[in-house]
């Protein structure tokens, strides 16, 4: 079992280390561009207030954080979590002018943040890549405020 988890972790990391520069283009091709509409709708469902706090896990290139920030007047506190070094650097580069967004290199299974902090926990196209879904979900529950919303987008 442990080898399987390690193998998946290595495989996922290797894939994202290779595709990080073209990740958004790949999503455009695989979804025929519809992923952009889905992400807009995802943010619509959140309907974030200016003081909302978001933790975006498996942030990748930062598109969910960017949309969330824009929708709420670039005011909310947003924490982006990304485990892959190349995607982490790409996301930070893409959102370098957003002062309300901070980046942490970490895994969904072990979030280095306090309990009961966030109004929203988002993960888009990432839950399939975590090595321990149950542990990741426990972490989501831990970091959300009571009444906070878990939002997952997959295709």
Predicted regions, residues:
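N-terminal, positively charged/glycine-rich alpha-helical extensions of SAM-dependent methyltransferases
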Residues: 1-24
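A short glycine-rich, Lys/Arg-flanked "PGG" loop and its adjoining helix->strand segment in the class I
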Residues: 134-146
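A short SAM/SAH-binding and catalytic strip from SAM-dependent methyltransferases
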Residues: 119-132
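Conserved alpha-helix/loop element of class I SAM-dependent methyltransferases that forms part
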Residues: 32-50, 67
């Amino acid at each position: 079992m442990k080898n399987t988890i390690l193998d998946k972790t290595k495989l996922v990391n290797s894939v994202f280390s290779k595709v990080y520069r073209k990740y958004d283009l790949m999503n455009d091709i695989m979804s025929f561009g519809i992923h952009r509409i889905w992400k807009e709708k995802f943010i619509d469902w959140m309907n974030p207030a200016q003081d909302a706090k978001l933790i975006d896990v498996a942030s990748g290139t930062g598109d969910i954080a960017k949309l969330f920030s824009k929708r709420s007047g670039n005011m909310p506190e947003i924490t982006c979590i990304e485990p892959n070094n190349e995607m982490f650097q790409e996301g930070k580069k893409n959102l370098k002018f957003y002062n309300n967004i901070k980046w942490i290199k970490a895994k969904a299974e072990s979030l280095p943040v306090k309990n009961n902090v966030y109004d929203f926990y988002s993960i888009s196209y990432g839950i399939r890549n975590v090595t321990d879904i149950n542990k990741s979900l426990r972490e989501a529950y831990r970091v959300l405020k009571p009444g906070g919303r878990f939002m997952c987008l997959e295709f």
